[in-house]
Curated annotation (Swiss-Prot):
Its EC number is 1.1.1.94. It comes from the Bacteria. GO terms for cellular component: cytosol. It comes from Bartonella henselae (strain ATCC 49882 / DSM 28221 / CCUG 30454 / Houston 1). This is Glycerol-3-phosphate dehydrogenase [NAD(P)+]. The gene is gpsA.
Length: 340
């Protein structure tokens, strides 16, 4: 019998925030991170001084430095790590899983180097029998941790699992959880919105104003939807929390690292200096390459993503990228929706 309701792998800002929410909801939670010194600090100070210094841990949130202990303590394993290490984390935890284990992830992105959905990665490494679920939606870790009202979406490989997770996380005072059966759409929305957010930041950094920002968000949503439909997702998913909701949040609020990174580029800061100034992982920078790779592989037109890719990886200037988008052939607004 597992004694812990949830083990969370990843003691960054988002993993910590999710652990706090679960613990406040009365559940016993273990929080594991790869850096033993960081875990010792969490244990000593009972808060995450590096990322959420003003939020104290509930008594039933326990930082744990042993991966084996953390995994074996609960059947529910939630992974909240950057997308480029997701693959390795699955390999690391696999020896400690048992026949009752279930995997959830809050990682937003595609597999580094392949552009595969994280669901595909999990199935390849863990097999077909283990239940899978993904968390996504418009959430900033700080607001989640301090208890401001937040809504999120869960998509799982079976209905019973998603309903159980919905009940586990739902907190009447501040945290509302929706179900969605479309795992593909939920994953893609969370991955591609970071790329579009860099574009929104570039636009604002260049001083293009509110009109341009909203046009970019709207056409970005069209790109996400077009890619999703080609991958087998439901169009309605992109009108919800993990599509429109997460996209608008990430493109318009300066808590978003992706938006801030783009703003620096738009102001003329070079890529390496912009990454240095953000001083945390910019998922959109990593995922632009993977999203571009995926779009080319399945032959889906994504002009905003393409121009951001050229800026980040091919040396194109932000002004050249903006001109390329503005000078594209005129289109019917719905051309890219009805073609599927």
């Amino acid at each position: 019998m597992h004694a812990v309701s949830m083990t969370i792998i990843g003691a960054g800002s988002y993993g910590t925030a999710l652990a706090i929410v679960l613990a406040r909801n009365g559940h016993h939670v273990l929080l594991w991170g790869y850096n033993p010194q960081h875990i010792r600090e969490l244990q000593e100070y009972r808060c995450n001084q590096a990322f959420l210094p003003d939020v104290q841990f509930p008594d039933n949130l326990c930082p744990e430095d042993s991966l084996e202990t953390a995994i074996k303590a609960s059947r529910n394993i939630l992974i909240a790590v950057p997308s480029h290490v997701f693959h390795q984390v699955l390999y690391n935890i696999r020896p400690y899983l048992d026949q009752h284990s279930r995997i959830i992830w809050a990682t937003k992105g595609l597999e580094h180097g392949t552009g595969r959905l994280l669901q595909e990665v999990a199935r390849e490494i863990l097999g077909d029998k283990i239940p899978l679920a993904v968390f996504s939606g418009p959430t900033f870790a700080k607001e989640l941790a301090i208890g401001l009202p937040t809504a999120i979406t869960i998509a799982a490989s079976d209905t019973e699992f998603s309903e159980e997770l919905q009940q586990l996380f739902h907190f009447d005072k501040s945290f509302r959880v929706y179900k969605n059966s479309d795992m593909i759409g939920v994953q893609l929305g969370g991955a591609v919105k970071n790329v579009i957010a860099i574009g929104a930041g570039i636009s604002d950094g260049m001083g293009f104003g509110a009109n341009a920002r909203i046009a970019l968000i709207t056409r970005g949503l069209a790109e996400i939807s077009r890619l999703g439909i080609a991958m087998g997702a439901e169009l309605s998913t992109f009108m919800g929390m993990t599509g429109l909701g997460d996209l608008v949040l990430t493109c318009t609020d300066n808590q978003s690292r992706n938006r801030r990174f783009g703003m620096l580029l738009g102001q003329g800061v070079d890529i390496e200096e912009a990454k240095k100034q953000i001083d945390q992982i910019v998922e959109g920078y990593l995922n632009t390459k993977e999203v571009h790779m995926l779009a080319q592989r399945i032959r889906v037109e994504m002009p905003i993503t393409e121009q951001i890719y050229h800026v980040l990886y091919c040396g194109k200037s932000v002004s050249e990228a903006a001109n390329a988008l503005l000078s594209r052939q005129l289109k019917d607004e719905m051309y890219d929706t009805v073609r599927f």
